[in-house]
Amino acid sequence: MDFSTLFRTKENLSLDKNTLTILRYIAIIGQILAISIVFYYLNLPFPIIESYLIISMGLATNLYLQFGIKINQLKDFYAAPFLLIDLLQLSALLYLTGGIFNPFSFLLIIPTIVSSTFLSMGTTIILGFITSILLLTISFFHLPLPGEDMNLLHFPNFYKIGIIISILIGLIFLSYFGIRFAG
């Protein structure tokens, strides 16, 4: 492998701004629905206001992407920061809502998978590394899963380790697949 080409993208590798914007709106709507159902329908307490604030930051950056960025084909320089914001935003939400025990924690790999399909290998490796660090961080530092502090749930350590390993394997497998077969 020639490492000098790691961060070069082929001319045909870019992420359509409209595609990224729509994906991010889908994520935002899903996040709003998930936390609203858990808080208002299931009546499980967690930091709902902080969660809405985190989601609103994602919405603000998506509005900037949609209306502030004038180019339509996003190369690494433009797309990677938004994917990084998505990683940080979802990690913050997961921190507030149970860390890796949250059933939505596997979604943390999506920004890296998007990168592997549309951006350079170097960007994908960096996002994959950051994803791994964030995954490990929210595995050990997080607020309780809604309902966990009410003795409704208890997870042994081997289960936590299994979740970490399964998400990391999914990250590596799907990233490789995207790099290998995209473009």
Predicted regions and their residues:
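C-terminal ends of transmembrane helices
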Residues: 16, 62-71
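Alpha-helical transmembrane segments and their interfaces in multipass membrane proteins
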Residues: 17, 29, 33-55, 71-81, ...
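Alpha-helical transmembrane segments
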Residues: 22-32, 81-89
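Alpha-helical transmembrane segments of multipass membrane proteins
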Residues: 32-37, 63, 91-95, 113-114, ...
